[in-house]
Structures are given as structure tokens and as C-alpha cells.
């Protein structure tokens, strides 16, 4: 069995690396690299199902492999892979979602002159994520972690001729660099105190240590990578990249890496109340804040981006509840419908002459029925509609939240955020799909291309059945609460329905609204993203620049000028005055100087 696991993983890596290695081939004329990349990912997906089926059939808990890589006198670094529920379920999902995204990208990016390089970037992005997921030691995990970071920079800034794309890419790197500091510090702490980076050894050796400091480092790392409150502004900015990049970034790679890190190292956290409470409160705050921002945005991709951030907040809350499995389940179900929402958005944007403002859409159901249907299915799955993929994870999370002993504010914020999910999802569907068309009649609408429909259809199936399939084959590690009052059981559904009713009321009010931009403080707060980018990206740099300028001026005036040339001039002034008085035409002075010079000349002779 171990042999099958190893050989299948190595085969997956080899298949995925083959298109990348062909870059070294000097004779590449006429090769369809983009199509080859898509085929490689689809083949890797089918191969990855083999170890998953064997694993589920044998009911094993996990398989760990270990090869020594290098060692110093005191420290070993190994290459070790971990095959357990998390890695063996996530890898096929990541490959499946990427396969659909690459197929969509064949259509979306067909006119790009560098499409081959674009596909290689996406493939490297996926490989880095697979390395991160299957890693059993911190060093390997760090390689995958940095890999997804650098590839996100290259992909977000793909259209580097645009200043906004460059700024967004740089923003993503800088915010993630803050998170990386947390991970590097934690790894340094592990190396110094536990003398090991092997995850299994860390679990055993950490029993005698107070793990608060490294866990805070891990929380910081997850905050940066998974765009939690405080380090979240890079996520909506990342929408400057092409739509396939947004889909891959938000579904199964970059943004879930932070949450996955906490899931992998969760045994360290489960008895540390400070770390759990930090995750819980941070997640609740992120979920509500980003859901609030999504309510008033008008850019279709930004609304979907904020919904991602809100769902990541929900995953963080789940980790704070000591339920890493539920967080993982939500990662898996979320990947399908989030990728599908982005691909539908991309299809709509492309069909409406690159229009992203939802106020200039509408009535697409009669013109683009397939895309509109899938878009609606994705939005329903996101809100947690019963029996779609999102319901299985979201409902379980809200149940766990309602039946736990925890901070009541965190519970309230999360429930409000869940309600807001229904509001912005309905608003999105209402403006894009329903109503009358509000766009130019000349738009080149065509959704007959099989590359578009097949890729979105594949994800739509995932959005419908993935939750059921995963929950049927995934035994919970912790016993869930089996009995609870009906109101608690229905809480998730009730808040979603409440949000839906509010959204319908708001949609009716929108048509009666006279002013284009109503000056309401709450609306303004939400529309300006809580003034966060303004404060962080404008006010703070301005204050620092002003402080720097005043410090430089003071140094220049006092030390460099007053103590330098001016100070020197002042000290020489007395001497200069004395010597200057000589040439004023006074006969007494001349005679005195003449006599003194004469005496000085005669003295050596007399002596």
C-alpha cells in the first residue's frame, strides 16, 4: 500500500512537472503547451483517485514516508510526505478544480501571446500547493508556502503594463511577507527548542513547553496568507489579475494555505486557550467585516473576492472552536462553488466587453441561460442552501458554534456574517441575472464554446454533490453534538432566510432610490472598505514620510549645517576679525607690525 501511495504521488509530480521541464527544450515551435498542461492536470486527477480509493477502503489513519535529505551535527532535514485524510482528499479536489480552470483559461486567454507561460505559472502554483499539502515537515511546508506566494505575485501582476496590476501584486507580496515573518519565527522556535522540524516529532516534543509564542506566530502566518482582518486588503486588490488566476487563487490554493497550516498543526493548539480564542475572535471579525464590505461593492469580482474572505473567516472560527475537520470540509466544498462563481464572472465579463460593474448588467438569464444557472447554483451553495455542497460544511460549523461554550460576541458576529452572505449573494444574482438588460446591445455574447460550458458544468456538479460525497467518506475525529433544540438546529437556515428577505427588501428599495450614491455613513463605510486601505495605504505612509522629512530637515539644519560649515565659520570669526583689522590704513598698526617683523628677523642673529 505504501508503495502505491509513493508511486502514485511521484507519478502525479512527474506528470505535472513534464510540461514545466519542456521549457528547457530548444525546439518548441508549434507545440500546444497550454493544451498539454490541461491534459497533464486531468491525468494527474484520475491517478490521484487511486490512492484515495485504496486509503478509504483500508480505513487507515495515515501513512508517513521519510527520506533523509541533509543533516548537520545537531539537526536533520528530511523529505517526508504525509498521506492522511487531509492530503489525500485535498489533492484530487485541487487537481479537479485546476483542470476546470485551465480548460476555461484556454478560452479566456486564447489571444494572449504568452499563454504558454501563463499555463506554466498556473501549473507551478498548483505544484507548490501540492507540496504544501503533502509535506510532513516544516521545511517542505515552507517551500510550498513560499512557492504559492511567489507564483501569486507573478500571476496577479500578469498584465504588468497596468499600474494597478503591479500595485496589487506588490501588495499581495508585502502583506504575505508580514505573515511569513510569523512562520519563519515559529520554525526558528521549533529548531531552537525542539531541535526538529518533523511535524509528528513536534507534536510529541512540545508537550513540556508553553507553545503560546510559536502559536501566535502561526496565527500571524495564517492571517497574512488567508487574508484575515488586519492583513486582508491584498485579497480584493488581487482581482487585478486575470479571472482564471482569481479562481485558482481563491478556491484551492493560496488563500486556504494559511487555514491548512493551522489544520496540520492543530494538535499543538487544541489545549492552548489563548491561541484558540485568538483564532475565534479574529475569524469572527474577518467574517463580519468582509461580508459588510461585500454588501455595497459594485464590481462583480470584488464581491466574490470579499465572499472568499468572509468564508475564510468562518474557517478560522471553526479552528477556534477546536474543529479542524469541519474547517477542512469547508475548504473542500468551498473550492468548487468559489471557482465556479469566478469562472461564471469571467464568462460574463468577457461577453459584456470587459464590463465588471453589476449595475451595467442584468437580464442575463434569457441571453446566457447556462452561465446564469450555474452562477445561481454557486450563489445558493455559498449561502448554505440545503443539500448543495456548502450546506454540509456550513451547517455543521454553525451547529458546532451554537453548541460550544464560547465568546458570545464571536457567535453573534459569525451569525450576522452568515446572514450577510445571503444578502450579497442575492444582490449579486438580482443585479446580474434578473431584471432587464442594462448593457450595450452590441456586446458579443456567446456561451456556446464547449471549453466554457464544460469547465463550469464540471464545477457545478462538484457544487451540488461534493458535500454529500465527502461527508459520506469522512468520519469525524470528534463526536459532534447529537441532540439539540430545533431552533439551534435550524439556526444556520434561519439566519440565511432572514438575510434573503432583507436582500429582497433592499432590492425593491434600490429601484426607488433617487440619488446614485446616497450619503449614508454606514453605506459609505462599507463602500470604502471600512476606510482600511485609505488609512493603511495613504495615511500611514504620509505620516511616516512627514516624520522622515522633518527628521531629515532637523538633522540637516542642526548637525550637518550648524555643527558643520556654519559652526566652523563661527569659531574662525574672531581670528578672522583680528587679521582683518590689519589692512585698514592705520599707520600705528603698520609701524607695530614692521617693528615686530624686524625684531623676529634680528633675534636669530643676536642669539
Curated annotation (Swiss-Prot):
It is found in: Mitochondrion inner membrane. Its main location: mitochondrion. GO terms for molecular function: NADH dehydrogenase (ubiquinone) activity. It catalyses: a ubiquinone + NADH + 5 H(+)(in) = a ubiquinol + NAD(+) + 4 H(+)(out). Core subunit of the mitochondrial membrane respiratory chain NADH dehydrogenase (Complex I) that is believed to belong to the minimal assembly required for catalysis. Complex I functions in the transfer of electrons from NADH to the respiratory chain. The immediate electron acceptor for the enzyme is believed to be ubiquinone. Belongs to the complex I subunit 5 family. This is NADH-ubiquinone oxidoreductase chain 5. It comes from Carassius auratus.
